[in-house]
Swiss-Prot record:
Annotated keywords: DNA-binding, Transcription, Transcription regulation
GO molecular function, one term: DNA binding
Superkingdom, taxonomy of origin: Bacteria
Protein name: HTH-type transcriptional regulator Rv1719
Ranges where the HTH iclR-type domain occurs: 13-75
Keyword Transcription regulation set for record: yes
Binding partners and assembly: Homodimer.
Lineage of the organism: Bacteria, Bacillati, Actinomycetota, Actinomycetes, Mycobacteriales
Amino acid sequence: MSAEEQDTRSGGIQVIARAAELLRVLQAHPGGLSQAEIGERVGMARSTVSRILNALEDEGLVASRGARGPYRLGPEITRMATTVRLGVVTEMHPFLTELSRELDETVDLSILDGDRADVVDQVVPPQRLRAVSAVGESFPLYCCANGKALLAALPPERQARALPSRLAPLTANTITDRAALRDELNRIRVDGVAYDREEQTEGICAVGAVLRGVSVELVAVSVPVPAQRFYGREAELAGALLAWVSKVDAWFNGTEDRK
């Protein structure tokens, strides 16, 4: 490769990196930003920001209401995200089924969506008494196992944006003190497993954990269990979930035999 070709390739990579940076800034500000506000946040010249935004808008990756914005993520991003979610559900479903059969409990697959955890797939066991939500339901991050697992995996800045100004109690057990929640998230980062001890719904508990390398989106799996079966089984459920997560992560990262 000639020096000229190398320079061209390097310049192309730099443009892609800058475009990705702009998209991440807009993802963090769903209400939209002006060109000037975007430029301030990414530290680029206004002419560079304008050129990249125009190219992204032509591709439907950003959208604006006028020549100077505000700019938001465009419809093509939504279509891509939908495709990614469908792919994750398809690939993950056999693994969810395996875990549900092992524990004889419901297993939920959730994806981070702003300040909530969206349930995108679920496997339900034949148990007569079982904990069941529904695919399509959405829960606040701070009071459910899958949500807290997702929160704990976020960098501090994104974590702060994903929390409401007030941690409203959904039950008597909901953590409503920010310092206490921060301590809980620190523990989750160390242990790898999150607990919901009747914090989101009375009578329902859960363990949850994040899966890494499965999707470009942040994904969590939780095992909701009726409270009367949960207490006394916490260590068993957490251990089984962590072993399963390790196996699934290894499979998706290509370090486990796929035969």
